[in-house]
UniProtKB/Swiss-Prot annotation:
Keywords: Amino-acid biosynthesis, ATP-binding, Cytoplasm, Kinase, Nucleotide-binding, Threonine biosynthesis, Transferase. It is an enzyme of class 2 (transferase). Signal peptide: none annotated. GO terms for cellular component: cytoplasm. The lineage of its organism: Bacteria, Bacillati, Cyanobacteriota, Cyanophyceae, Synechococcales. It comes from Synechococcus sp. (strain CC9902). Gene3D superfamilies: 3.30.230.10, GHMP kinase, C-terminal domain (3.30.70.890). GO terms for molecular function: ATP binding; homoserine kinase activity. It catalyses: L-homoserine + ATP = O-phospho-L-homoserine + ADP + H(+). Its main location: cytoplasm. Belongs to the GHMP kinase family. Homoserine kinase subfamily. One of its GO terms (biological process) is threonine biosynthetic process. This is Homoserine kinase. ATP binds at residues 97-107. The gene is thrB. Its EC number is 2.7.1.39.
């Protein structure tokens, strides 16, 4: 195992994720077929040097430097492998907009981990990368499906070991993700939540989560509709999203089975049958337009393969 050559380059594709899906707060997430692409290469210089090049206007506020999430994740790999840090450049084709509830920070973490690991011959297993990703992010619901793909339920067992269960999401269930031009930080969304919740609310969520998972497995719209309800976080977060209630109602009126805040928001996730996808998409965009917010609402599939890397020619 050796340090990467100057100019050595890898390309890492990392999917967007939608977390919580209503009742699965901080434990349930799914990868979507919308990817950020990171072209990472070693450049001249020692550790603490990281250059970031963003393709796309959404990331104009993002900066390089040693505190960047991509580079912080890369440093964790090198430390675990017993290697000294090296200077890196990342050129990012940004399709997952930041601060929209689609796991953009998870894509940065996973790309940094996977890219750095690939550059030094993959000394760390995927299980170790997963452990590092959760530790950096602080919660598993985005980084786990971002790395592994599909619909993932993650929980910390009594042994303190993270356990991941891949759940089935039938292809007949489509995800419409309405992505607004407004932003909402995860920290702000978390501050809106209470420190404690009633036991009755926790019980409702446990039942709803069971119904939702069965509905996603079978494509049963009634189960999805009954399961896509939450009392832990959404009652406190919808008020932070301008026009959010109207967007949710528009999606339901257009035929969606259920609707939820995607991650911490402000994007809104609607689940529906394939033949309802475009109608739900148009209705959500119109509702946000009426609230004075520009948006787009792609109809997406669940991405089942997760993140992957490929070698690229040296530069």
């Amino acid at each position: 195992m050796a340090q990467p050559r100057i100019g050595q380059r890898v390309i890492v594709d990392v999917p967007a994720t939608t977390a919580n899906l209503g009742p699965g707060f901080d434990c349930l997430g799914a990868a979507l077929d919308l990817n950020n692409r990171f072209a990472m290469r070693r450049i001249e210089g020692g550790g603490e040097r990281f250059e970031l090049i963003i393709e796309g206007s959404e990331g104009s506020h993002l900066r390089g430097g040693p505190e960047n999430l991509v580079y912080r994740a890369a440093q964790r790999v090198w430390k675990a492998a017993g290697l000294e840090p090296v200077a890196l450049e990342a050129r990012v084709r940004l399709a997952v907009p930041p601060a929209r509830g689609l796991g953009s920070s998870a894509t940065a973490i996973v790309a940094g981990l996977m890219g750095a690991n690939a550059l030094v011959g993959e000394p760390l297993s995927k299980e170790k990368l997963l452990e590092l990703a959760i530790d950096i992010e602080g919660h598993p619901d985005n980084v786990v499906p971002s790395l592994l793909g599909g619909l993932c339920m993650t929980a910390k067992a009594a042994s303190q070991r993270w356990r991941v269960v891949r759940c089935e999401w039938t292809s007949t269930v489509k995800a419409v993700v309405a992505i607004p031009s407004i932003r909402l930080s995860t920290s702000e969304a978390r501050r809106a939540m209470p420190k404690a919740i009633p036991v009755s609310d926790a019980v409702v969520n446990l039942g709803a989560l069971t119904l939702l998972l069965q509905g996603l497995r079978t494509g049963n719209g009634d189960l999805i509709s009954d399961g896509m309800h939450d009392r832990l976080h959404e009652p406190y977060r919808w008020r932070l999203i301008k026009g959010g209630d109207q967007v949710k109602q528009a999606a339901m009126d257009a035929g969606a089975w259920g609707c939820a805040i995607s991650g911490a928001g402000p994007s809104v996730l609607a689940l529906c049958a394939e033949d309802k996808g475009m109608a739900v998409s148009r209705a959500m965009v119109r509702a946000w337009e009426a609230a004075g917010v520009a948006s787009r609402a792609p109809v997406l599939n669940v991405q089942t393969t997760g993140s992957h890397w490929q070698p690229a020619d040296d530069e």
